[in-house]
Amino acid sequence: MAAKDFKFKFTEEMVIELLRGNEEAEDWYDAMCEILPLWEIDTAERVAMFIAQCGHESNNFKVLSENLNYSADGLNKVFPKYFKNAGRDAAPYHRQPRKIANIIYANRMDNGPTESDDGWKFRGGGILQLTGRYNYTQFGKEVDMTAEQATEYVRTKKGALDSACWFWDTNDINKFADARDVKGATKRINGGYIGLEDRQKHYQHAMEVLSGHWEPSKVVYETIRLGSRGPTVKAVQEELEIGADGVFGPGTEAHVKKWQEKNGLTPDGVMGPKSLAMMFGED
């Protein structure tokens, strides 16, 4: 998908670099091209801040639903207000995400009581973890959906981006992006400064990549296997002198196994960093 609505050159290779380790980076790029300009997240500074902040909150765009799988000990430490300090025994809630959600989110953010199941239905979703009936209702109005419909939408790529952009716009975070103020954006998103160092690191890297001072590497030294896609797969295919479409299919796997066997490696069809370094002649 073309990125014609951005005010800078925004490429798929950039997103693959920034979402390194996310095998769906190409799909995220397509969704970003469709959604971000609609919310005026269209400059290098704004996109860098968006990807840095959302990447921190979602484990690099890989987690679209809140993880509430806490142990009893974890509940007492993370949510003492609802367990230890409230005199509630955490043992019955050990590794029970639904029960946990219905305790910690009951009777707030327009959620009903524990038995309503609202805590679970309206738990965190999307790349900025939209939470609570109130927020899902408000976002739903923006996209012409009910709160219940919105809970499903935010767990898709387009919906995750749309909901994050809605939050971004509602809280005027572009002004922090324009000022390159990572600390200010973090406070507005997080309510504090949790993860500030990681957010700053991601932002600096994003600015380097998006501002035109970065050249895409032919090979990213991470593990690729059947089902992987991207420039590293294409580079391997070119090295093996087979059809180079960037998709690691059964044919590519078969050729990789032959190459591995020829070079004294376990012929498992998986190319890790060491195998890639050997293939491309790097130490």
Q: Over which residues does each language-model region extend?
A:
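Peptidoglycan-targeting cell-wall enzymes and recognition modules
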Residues: 3-27, 55-166
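Surface-exposed patches in mature extracellular/periplasmic domains of secreted proteins
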Residues: 40-50, 63-67, 174-186
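Secretory-pathway/luminal and periplasmic proteins that interact with or process carbohydrate-rich
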Residues: 26, 56-66, 174, 191-199, ...
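Acidic, Ser/Thr/Pro/Gly-enriched interdomain connector segments
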Residues: 9-19, 211-247
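Acidic helix/loop microenvironments that form the catalytic cleft of cell-wall polysaccharide enzymes
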Residues: 54-57, 132, 177-196, 250-263
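Extracytoplasmic/secreted envelope proteins and their assembly/folding machinery
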Residues: 12, 29, 33, 47-50, ...
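Long, repeat-rich segments with strong aromatic
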Residues: 148-209
